[in-house]
């Protein structure tokens, strides 16, 4: 399986994402600079955290118009798995691949710590290695992670089981404690916590590694060649 890590000016979690795939998961991965125009040939696309374009205007709003994003959107609409973490989640929101928006954390402070998440839906491309209702520990590091959407959108997200991860505590003010959501097709996941920072016991745990293992497992199952 071949992964692409999209690198924007100001990305600072791209190396962590690369390490998670190459060293922890053991799969092939390339960096793709934001000026590239094609993601053809990649089986999964990863948008890392950071401060793309300095977070000017608002987080993710400029990165959304990078040349590479047109093809990321095309690939997502064709079913290619796309994972956006932290700033990557914000870019997915700005690109319209996921509903809603991000606000400043309710206490207007930058939050950087491990948090507990409850797995709300383990029947997705990204969560099949988890147990339904399981509590996992994944670090967060953000100042604008307060997920917001209108009441109707929230109702649809909950009804369609699109809420994948939920904070077990009030971390940043997100509606319904939402930490991560998928699109209706289930192939695009945005989440504020950083699974790529939880792939080794050496740095605090491996709860994030199972997300990448889920991607690999489901890709392999969908590419089984039968005689």
UniProtKB/Swiss-Prot annotation:
It is found in: Cytoplasm. The active site is at 86 (nucleophile), 194, 196. InterPro entries: Class_I_gatase-like, PRibForGlyAmidine_synth_PurQ. It comes from the Bacteria. Keywords: ATP-binding, Cytoplasm, Glutamine amidotransferase, Hydrolase, Ligase, Nucleotide-binding, Purine biosynthesis. One of its GO terms (biological process) is 'de novo' IMP biosynthetic process. Residues 3-225 form the Glutamine amidotransferase type-1 domain. Its main location: cytoplasm. Its EC number is 6.3.5.3, 3.5.1.2. The keyword Cell division does not apply. One of its GO terms (cellular component) is cytoplasm. Pathway: Purine metabolism; IMP biosynthesis via de novo pathway; 5-amino-1-(5-phospho-D-ribosyl)imidazole from N(2)-formyl-N(1)-(5-phospho-D-ribosyl)glycinamide: step 1/2. GO terms for molecular function: ATP binding; glutaminase activity; phosphoribosylformylglycinamidine synthase activity. SMART domains: GATase_5. It catalyses: N(2)-formyl-N(1)-(5-phospho-beta-D-ribosyl)glycinamide + L-glutamine + ATP + H2O = 2-formamido-N(1)-(5-O-phospho-beta-D-ribosyl)acetamidine + L-glutamate + ADP + phosphate + H(+); L-glutamine + H2O = L-glutamate + NH4(+). Part of the phosphoribosylformylglycinamidine synthase complex involved in the purines biosynthetic pathway. Catalyzes the ATP-dependent conversion of formylglycinamide ribonucleotide (FGAR) and glutamine to yield formylglycinamidine ribonucleotide (FGAM) and glutamate. The FGAM synthase complex is composed of three subunits. PurQ produces an ammonia molecule by converting glutamine to glutamate. PurL transfers the ammonia molecule to FGAR to form FGAM in an ATP-dependent manner. Part of the FGAM synthase complex composed of 1 PurL, 1 PurQ and 2 PurS subunits. This is Phosphoribosylformylglycinamidine synthase subunit PurQ. It comes from Halalkalibacterium halodurans (strain ATCC BAA-125 / DSM 18197 / FERM 7344 / JCM 9153 / C-125). The gene is purQ.
């Amino acid at each position: 399986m071949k992964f692409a890590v999209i690198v924007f000016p100001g990305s600072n979690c791209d190396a962590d994402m690369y390490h998670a795939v190459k060293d922890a998961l053991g799969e092939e991965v390339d960096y793709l600079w934001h000026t590239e125009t094609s993601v053809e040939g990649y089986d999964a696309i990863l948008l890392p955290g950071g401060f793309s374009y300095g977070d000017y205007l608002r987080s993710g709003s400029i990165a959304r118009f990078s040349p590479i994003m047109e093809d990321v959107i095309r690939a997502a609409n064709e079913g290619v798995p796309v994972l956006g973490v932290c700033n990557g989640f914000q870019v997915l929101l700005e690109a319209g691949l996921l509903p809603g928006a991000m606000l400043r954390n309710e206490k207007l402070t930058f939050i950087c710590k491990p948090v507990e998440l409850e797995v709300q839906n383990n029947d997705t491309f990204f969560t099949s290695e988890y147990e339904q209702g399981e509590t996992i520990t994944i670090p967060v590091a953000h100042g604008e992670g307060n997920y917001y959407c209108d009441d109707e959108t929230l109702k649809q997200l909950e009804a369609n089981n699109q809420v994948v991860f939920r904070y077990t505590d009030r971390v940043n003010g997100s509606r319904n404690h939402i930490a991560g959501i998928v699109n209706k097709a289930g192939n695009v996941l945005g989440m504020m916590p950083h699974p790529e920072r939880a792939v080794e016991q050496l740095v605090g745990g491996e709860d994030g590694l199972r997300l990448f293992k889920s991607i690999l497992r489901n890709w392999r199952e969908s590419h089984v060649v039968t005689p």
